[in-house]
Regions:
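Soluble non-transmembrane domains of integral membrane proteins
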Residues: 5-271
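Helix-loop-helix
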Residues: 22, 128-129, 140-162, 226-228, ...
């Protein structure tokens, strides 16, 4: 039946996670709102990923092209599907919702385009059931495409000038993760045969993807349609003999970048959660953070618990460093005396200082060690906060309503600066005046630097500083008491 009423052009589908619009012309996914994600913090409007408006175009197309395919423009205008209803809603008791669109070709081939939605799932099954009631063999190629304008990323939360990747990722068994931005697609269009691969369009926190059937060979292609980027795949021809029925299709994913979900959709799709070059630290950090969140239910408290855990892992290293610094502080008068005696003879001064350090078991670089060791953890946690959609709009307490962006009132960075100043008082004053000046400026420089960091990261540093100050204060008092005993 090709006389579907064009005034009811759209089929509306609502599940627990989606509010989706399907265009009955060709049966494309032209709009999708993600009901569990707000567009803005404290907003009541869901985040829209797919969209087809005058200002914005980002859709998932699928069709049957080739010799007899109804979506082949040579075979006439695009098919207009009919549906039993114009709106479908997943009932509370349902775990699956199937939406069937029907079309019959002039030659008598019945085509059902079936969309399958599952509860709490962002994967959508797109399948064609082709029943050839004609007298001749029928042949067409299944295709799936991501079609998008080149507008920026509306979901991006810019952090310290770093922007999330916006563009296409293609996965093949030979090259499991290859990125292409719009410039790459323009200069080097893709055209390769792939089996067991996928293609996805990434933005900050969210993605859309097409995943062909396992072991199904497909031609991955990128082209341009005016100002639009077209990224998709085409299967080899599907042949349906007269009187036979054949099924063909693929999976689409329209949703958040969540590792657990993506792992179940396709191999390597979880790599779209890009934790940077320190992923081997970032991933375990995220797993632990997520585990804490499962217990306490607050991402801010989870970050505090993670900080305590990391501090515990580096406890002995920090203790060794703080002992060295406490001894350095205790011998400060001796260093000052040396400066008076050998100030003009730098060589002698250096020799005497090293001898003193050796005698008192002081490592002059000991103070840098805890910070140096923690830097990879700090950088990794930055990527965890930047990339994890779970932390988008995640509140902590009081004025912190979103841990993934900067503190709106700069209170945490100021607390962090104050804690650094307090820590500096516990450290020995460097013998070199220039070095001493630099050390005094450090808390100010760090505070300015941290003003625009995600609040979750500043929270980590504040808690880490408080724990460090407690440990350092205890060790310094202990060493000073021991050295005072030695004198007596």
């Amino acid at each position: 039946n090709n006389t579907a009423n064009i005034s009811d052009q759209y089929v509306h589908v609502i599940t627990d996670v989606f509010d989706i619009t399907i265009d009955r012309v060709s049966g494309n996914l032209v709009s999708s709102s993600l009901l569990q994600y707000d567009r803005e913090l404290n907003g009541n409007e869901p985040l829209k990923l797919l969209s087809s408006t005058q200002n914005r175009l980002y859709v998932l197309e699928s069709g049957l092209i080739g010799r007899d395919g109804p979506d082949n423009s040579r075979n006439g205008s695009a098919p207009v599907y009919s549906s039993a209803q114009t709106s479908y809603q997943m009932a509370e008791s349902e775990n699956q919702l199937e939406v069937d669109l029907s079309y019959t070709t002039d030659s008598g081939v019945n085509i059902v385009k079936r969309f399958t939605f599952n509860r709490d799932d962002y994967e959508i099954g797109v399948r064609y059931l082709i029943d050839n009631q004609s007298e001749n063999e029928w042949q067409a190629n299944f295709t799936g495409k991501i079609v998008r304008d080149q507008a920026g990323d509306q979901t991006s939360q810019n952090s310290m000038g770093i922007k999330a990747f916006l563009g296409l990722v293609v996965s093949t068994p030979e090259d499991p993760y290859e990125k292409y931005d719009f410039d790459d697609l323009r200069e080097n269009p893709l055209n390769q045969s792939v089996t067991n691969g996928w293609l996805a369009f990434l933005q900050h926190y969210f993605l859309t993807a097409w995943v062909p059937e396992p072991d199904q060979q497909a031609q991955f292609q990128t082209t341009r349609r005016g100002p639009l980027a077209v990224m998709g795949f085409v299967y080899p021809a599907t042949t349906v003999p007269a009187g036979n029925t054949v099924e063909v299709g693929a999976s689409a994913y329209v949703g958040p970048k969540i590792i657990d979900r993506l792992e179940t959709v396709a191999p390597n799709l979880d790599r779209t959660v890009d934790f940077g070059w320190l992923f081997f630290i970032s991933l375990p950090l995220f797993i632990v953070l997520d585990w804490f969140h499962g217990i306490v239910g607050n991402w801010g408290v989870s970050i505090i618990l993670l900080t305590v855990l990391v501090k515990g892992l580096f406890f002995h290293l920090s203790a060794t460093s703080y002992r060295s610094m406490a001894r350095m502080r205790a011998v400060a008068p001796k260093l000052a005396r040396m400066k008076e005696l050998y100030g003009d003879d730098r060589q002698r001064m250096s020799t005497e200082m090293m001898a003193l350090y050796k005698r008192e078991k002081i490592n002059p670089l000991g103070g840098c060690l805890p910070i140096l060791v923690q830097m990879p953890v700090f950088i990794s946690l930055y990527w965890v906060l930047f990339e994890s959609v779970q932390l988008r709009h995640a509140p902590f307490a009081l004025w912190i309503h979103d841990l993934s962006v900067m503190d709106p009132y700069f209170i945490l960075p100021i607390i962090m600066g104050a804690s650094m100043m307090l820590q500096m008082h516990l450290n020995p004053t460097p013998p070199d005046p220039m070095q001493a000046k630099i050390m005094k400026l450090m808390p100010i420089v760090f505070t300015i630097f941290f003003l625009w960091f995600p609040a979750g990261l500043v929270l980590y540093w504040v808690v880490n500083n408080i724990l460090s100050i407690s440990q350092q204060w205890y060790i310094t008092r202990k060493i000073e008491a021991q050295m005072a005993e030695k004198k007596h």
